[in-house]
């Protein structure tokens, strides 16, 4: 239990901007971080949901409301996953060989492809949030999407081999076993039940669409890079949440 709590503290300090007391990082805590990843999603989702509610009461235009609501998940996570999205887009869209793509993936400079990709992402996500406000969609979707995406990404992260260049990814997955996978599956099943209760069968449809989207992202990155990494996880998470948001606009 102590190591699980340490893993949660490490996850909060790593994946959010929430100030946390100092915790010494070690392998015992690191191997529990992925189990805690859906909890991080719950925190991000609650902040997104509450932000939606509060901003929706402001006497400002729907355009400004949409922009403010859209950036909440990026702000609370310190742009961490957005950085991974940009790095992966830069590498894949370069259309180079595998070795060069891996070099681009680790390169800290920002390329044109990543900038164009994030602009497209922002346009679509802004439009989806605008639709949420305009058509009064169920805001609980904003609470559940970050949980679902992180749960699925965490499962893939501890299941699929990490690329050798991803030292941090190996650090998180070292010492994980079948028990961690079972816990993540049970967590996803619980979320699935709750999501279904709130949204009915449409909730299950959205969950399946997000699962397929993340799975396709991971499969594409395995083909391109030979494995998974922190950047790949961030890329898959961002795309999964965007697809989930877009699906919610279409089907709810």
UniProtKB/Swiss-Prot annotation:
Entry's Gene Ontology BP terms: cobalamin biosynthetic process
Coiled coil (UniProt feature): none
EC nos: 2.7.8.26
Reactions listed under catalytic activity: alpha-ribazole + adenosylcob(III)inamide-GDP = adenosylcob(III)alamin + GMP + H(+); alpha-ribazole 5'-phosphate + adenosylcob(III)inamide-GDP = adenosylcob(III)alamin 5'-phosphate + GMP + H(+)
Annotated compartments: Cell membrane
Transmembrane stretches, start-end: 4-24, 38-58, 60-80, 113-133, 141-161, 190-210, 232-252
Pathway: Cofactor biosynthesis; adenosylcobalamin biosynthesis; adenosylcobalamin from cob(II)yrinate a,c-diamide: step 7/7
Record's keyword terms, sorted: Cell membrane, Cobalamin biosynthesis, Magnesium, Membrane, Transferase, Transmembrane, Transmembrane helix
Cofactor(s) needed by this chain: Mg(2+)
Topology versus the membrane: Multi-pass membrane protein
Listed GO CC annotations: plasma membrane
Family: Belongs to the CobS family.
Protein known as: Adenosylcobinamide-GDP ribazoletransferase
Provenance organism: Clostridium botulinum (strain Eklund 17B / Type B)
